[in-house]
Amino acid sequence: MRAAMNFRINNSLLIEAERDAVLELRHAMHREPELSNNEWKTQQRIRGMLERFGLKGATVFHNTGLYIDIEGSASGPKRAVAVRGDIDALPIQETRDDLPYQSHVEGVMHACGHDLHASIAMGVALAFHRMRNNFAGKLRVFFQPAEEAEPLGGRTVLEERLLEGFDNAVGFHVTPSIQVGKFGAREGAVSKSSDQFKVTVSGSAAHGSTPHNGIDAITIAAAFVNEVQKVISREVPVDDRSVITIGTIHGGEATNIICPKVVMEGTIRTTNPELRPLLSQRVREIAEGVAALHRGKAEVVVTSGEPAVINDPEMVRLFRDAVSDMAGSDALTQGKAISGSDDFGFYSQCIPSIYFWFGSGEPGNESGVHTPTFAVSDDVLIPTTELAVKYCFDLLHGQSAR
């Protein structure tokens, strides 16, 4: 028996047609995954399903995304809550041929569970549309494109002020590190910010036998790689978990030529918003300083990515209550903060937010996200959707997280 069958959540918040739609969308998205900023078929599929259930007037954002507003007509506090389900896939070849809904797109798969996230968001939208006479306030459901790659859909939500007037935002992510049937949420930072940098080191060429006649860009680059890590080990508090990674390094054309140019690219990650600009500044200072020390030059370009996702403590408390009510206290786990990033950080930068995890780990489904063997049982989908419905209802209907 699968662990998911032990859920106390009992399909009471979704009607049969809604449950079927959630599964239908998950399977269709998994069969036809689309990469970031190219989710055109996915967008039309989502719009079609919304309209099939009477939800018309979805608004396009970020070209390939949609959001839908559902207004409640009951008396009560007129709160506004946003829900995010991301929809993009990854450039990975799926190798799980045991799935009846295996990806039909060569080299592309839903290796991060966004097919589940979007389907849960769909279930929330359909349930609240049906129950619109039973709640007060407004629910906005985002089917957000481009979580995985720039330009990021979450940044568009921030820049176009799509959360203006909203009280709370709800996001979620599947994880095989948590057992099926369990849900996790923790207060504070649950992911790192992610900024990208490019360092171009310039020297001058010379014959390999006469290095004194040139300026060796490889030597400068090597010094930078060593020195920049001292920022983490000597300038950042040990419990901050900041990371500076050099991901690519390119330079040199021949074994007997002093290299005149090296290009390096990497990422800067931290959970501390105050450290974020300082780390970028130090990368720049070290690159320029090391280059000057060796009589070369360095040009540094830093591109801001997503901020850290920050969970609001009161929203976490209310979420734990919802899990206990629906699945029992033994279904609760704190979960571990991730070292990666998620553009839901743009949402939590705007308004009090929560980003909770739902477990998918079970025999046969242990592979991590972003791997070709990642898979999640359908069994987790409906219980998680119903929990999301219950939680959003609590936020909207008199269970203020503020």
Curated annotation (Swiss-Prot):
Domain of life: Bacteria
Primary enzyme class: hydrolase
Gene3D superfamilies found in the cross-reference section: 3.30.70.360, Zn peptidases
Enzyme nomenclature, EC number: 3.-.-.-
Similarity remark: Belongs to the peptidase M20 family.
NCBIfam families: amidohydrolases
UniProt-recorded Gene Ontology molecular function terms: hydrolase activity
Entries under Pfam families matching the protein: M20_dimer, Peptidase_M20
InterPro entries from the UniProt entry: Amidohydrolase (IPR017439), Bact_exopeptidase_dim_dom (IPR036264), Peptidase_M20 (IPR002933), Peptidase_M20_dimer (IPR011650)
Top-level taxonomy: Bacteria, Pseudomonadati, Pseudomonadota, Alphaproteobacteria, Hyphomicrobiales
Protein name (record): Uncharacterized hydrolase y4tI
Keywords attached to this entry: Hydrolase, Plasmid
